[in-house]
């Protein structure tokens, strides 16, 4: 039997090339070997201030992008968290298993609440909801970045505590740190990770950037004064970052690229790289624009919610029975 994998994704605006290469691309590959659930976690998103219309737009955009990069709704379940009420219900039950002290120790809570006088309680109780998201599906593996590892440890602790205190119903999930899908750095400062929150828009590439924008961004990317196309992370971080992007999107090795551009300057290298990026993103963009306003996208999300509800409700019933909630049904 296939193992189950669960991935929660925040609907937070545009998706960068770094997100795509570092995570999305790999998550999509996992669907072939696992029983996969991809959840757009809009209830987690509201732990920080959101504009209502913007949030709705971001949810739809993310769903369309996931499908555009290759998520197959026949193989994986793609759904929106708030369309499966069991998440919020199970989240409350997990809050009643969690201790305030362990929630206050979460690094993300400390970071986001630092210096803020008014902190919403949802920021503190975010991890029990995340635990519920994962545990409702009998998840075996959770592909997460290093930044979420602490939350996943807490999920494991809460599941074990619940199993011990009430009934042994939860599978204890394992962390699956994806094999490094290359860490893509800022085009403007190659010592920093590429991020859409960078105030300089030339520092990052989004999956929906137009060809002219892409060309401009790549041509203005920081390199060095040497003029030699060579991979050397330590001394040539800018060129090394561009070589990494080229090698992944152009399906070629870094050694082949070094040989190809030997004796040639950065101008030609950047021009060719821009072409490779444009060609790699074109099919993703075409599929995205086909989907974004379509009934097909709604149908896929409806079916995903239906499947997720079926699975999640079964586990929710087990949780309610274990805790003694509601009435005993025959």
Swiss-Prot record:
EC number: 6.1.1.2
'KMSKS' region, short sequence motif: residues: 193-197
Main location: cytoplasm
Catalytic reactions of this protein: tRNA(Trp) + L-tryptophan + ATP = L-tryptophyl-tRNA(Trp) + AMP + diphosphate + H(+)
UniProt keyword list: Aminoacyl-tRNA synthetase, ATP-binding, Cytoplasm, Ligase, Nucleotide-binding, Protein biosynthesis
Binding annotation for ATP: 10-12, 18-19, 145-147, 184, 193-197
UniProt xrefs under Pfam families: tRNA-synt_1b
SS bond list: none
CDD domains, sorted: TrpRS_core
GO molecular function: ATP binding; tryptophan-tRNA ligase activity
Subcellular location: Cytoplasm
GO BP term (any one): tryptophanyl-tRNA aminoacylation
Short sequence motif named 'HIGH' region, residue ranges: 11-19
Keyword Nucleotidyltransferase (UniProt): no
Binding residues for L-tryptophan: 133
Functional note: Catalyzes the attachment of tryptophan to tRNA(Trp).
Family annotation (HAMAP family): Trp_tRNA_synth_B
Subunit structure: Homodimer.
The protein's name in its UniProt record: Tryptophan--tRNA ligase
Record organism: Bacillus subtilis (strain 168)
Gene that produces this protein: trpS
């Amino acid at each position: 039997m296939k193992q189950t994998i669960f991935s929660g994704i925040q609907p937070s605006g545009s998706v960068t090339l770094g997100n795509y290469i570092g995570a999305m691309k790999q998550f999509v590959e996992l669907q072939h070997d696992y029983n996969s659930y991809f959840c757009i976690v809009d209830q987690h998103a509201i732990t920080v201030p959101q504009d209502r219309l913007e949030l709705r737009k971001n949810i739809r955009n993310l769903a369309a992008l996931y499908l555009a990069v290759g998520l197959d709704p026949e193989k994986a379940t793609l759904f929106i968290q708030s369309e499966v009420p069991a998440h919020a219900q199970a989240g409350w039950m997990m809050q009643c298993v969690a201790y305030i002290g362990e929630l206050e120790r979460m690094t993300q809570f400390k970071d986001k609440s630092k210096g803020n006088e008014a902190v919403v309680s949802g920021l503190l109780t975010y991890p029990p909801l995340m635990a519920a998201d994962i545990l409702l599906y009998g998840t075996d593996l959770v592909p997460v970045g290093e930044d979420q590892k602490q939350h996943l440890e807490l999920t494991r602790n809460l599941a074990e505590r619940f199993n011990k205190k009430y009934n042994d119903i939860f599978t204890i999930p394992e962390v699956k740190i994806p094999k490094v899908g290359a860490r893509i750095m800022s085009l403007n400062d190659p010592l920093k990770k590429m991020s859409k929150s960078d105030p300089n828009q030339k520092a990052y590439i989004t999956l929906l950037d137009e060809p002219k924008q892409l060309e401009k961004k790549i041509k203005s990317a920081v390199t060095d004064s040497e003029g030699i196309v060579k991979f050397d992370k330590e001394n040539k971080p800018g060129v090394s970052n561009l070589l990494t992007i080229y090698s992944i999107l152009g399906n070629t090795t870094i050694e082949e690229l070094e040989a190809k551009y030997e004796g040639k300057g950065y101008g030609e290298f950047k021009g060719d790289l821009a072409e490779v990026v444009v060609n790699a993103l074109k099919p993703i963009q075409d599929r995205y624009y086909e989907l974004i306003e379509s009934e097909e996208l709604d149908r896929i999300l409806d079916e995903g919610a239906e499947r997720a509800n079926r699975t999640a409700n079964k586990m929710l019933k087990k949780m309610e029975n274990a805790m003694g909630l509601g009435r005993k049904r025959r």
